[in-house]
């Protein structure tokens, strides 16, 4: 729901706007934590290490994406504050077009560099194959990570920080359920963890 941040108490507006944002970011970090916790129940040290290293890489990439997406929030918020609907629409359209291209390029680059990235992370030999499998699947899901963050940035620019929180909360619940399915029932190991994460991120966009 769009919230008018230009009226009422400044501190109250900041608090009610920032709290859902902080919770959203916290929930986003739970993806890797949930993968680690669940794989530890079904796999050995190699599988757990693979997910641990893969989660670190994905967290770094997510932080970069979130940082880039913040520019969208600022641009749209300025246009909304100025009551310039055309500029707000223009910013939204340009952002979607730009990041659509960026997501595909970034996905291809990361897929080509997946093995060097695993080596740079000083991955133990026994965990290399699992880490490569985990990151390969997660990298395929990069467009959905970018899409979620861009959509969330647009909502926040419009003054709505609650909707992105609801999106990611549903995705986190789905991730946990899918992790137990893929790792517990189907015994897919690190690949199962990555599948759960990627599919739940897709759900957060849909």
Q: Would you name each region that the model predicts?
A:
Residues 1-18, 76-141, 185-206:
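Short alpha-helical transmembrane segments in multi-pass integral membrane proteins
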Residues 7, 11-30, 34, 57-64, ...:
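Residue-level signal for short hydrophobic patches within transmembrane helices
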Residues 21, 25, 37, 74, ...:
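Transmembrane alpha-helix boundary and packing residues in multipass membrane permease domains
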Residues 30-33, 41-45, 79-82, 157-158, ...:
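Helix-loop interface residues and adjacent transmembrane-helix termini in multi-pass membrane transporters
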Residues 39-59, 125-130, 190-195:
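Interfacial/gating helices of multi-pass transporter permease domains
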Residues 48-108, 145-164:
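Small-residue-rich hydrophobic transmembrane alpha-helices
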Residues 60-63, 107, 175-179, 205:
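Hydrophobic transmembrane alpha-helices of multi-pass small-molecule transporters
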Residues 99, 154-177, 195-198:
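Alpha-helical transmembrane segments of multi-pass membrane transporters/permeases
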């Amino acid at each position: 729901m769009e919230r008018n941040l230009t009226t009422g108490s400044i501190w109250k507006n900041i608090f009610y706007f920032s709290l859902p944002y902080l919770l959203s970011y916290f929930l986003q970090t739970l993806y890797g934590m949930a993968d680690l916790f669940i794989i530890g129940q079904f796999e050995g040290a190699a599988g757990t290490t693979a997910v641990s290293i893969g989660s670190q890489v994905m967290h770094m990439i997510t932080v970069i994406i979130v940082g880039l997406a913040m520019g969208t929030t600022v641009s749209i918020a300025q246009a909304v504050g100025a009551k310039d609907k055309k500029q707000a629409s223009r910013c939204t359209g340009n952002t979607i077009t730009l990041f659509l291209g960026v997501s595909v390029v970034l996905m291809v680059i990361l897929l080509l560099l997946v093995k060097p990235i695993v080596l740079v992370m000083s991955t133990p030999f026994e965990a290399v194959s699992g880490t490569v499998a985990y990151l390969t699947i997660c990298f395929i899901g990069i467009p959905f990570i970018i899409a979620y963050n861009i959509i969330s940035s647009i909502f926040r620019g419009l003054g709505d920080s609650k909707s992105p929180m609801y999106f990611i909360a549903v995705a986190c619940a789905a991730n946990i359920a899918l992790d137990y399915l893929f790792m517990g029932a189907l015994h897919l190991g690190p690949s199962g963890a990555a599948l759960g994460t990627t599919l739940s991120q897709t759900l957060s966009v849909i």
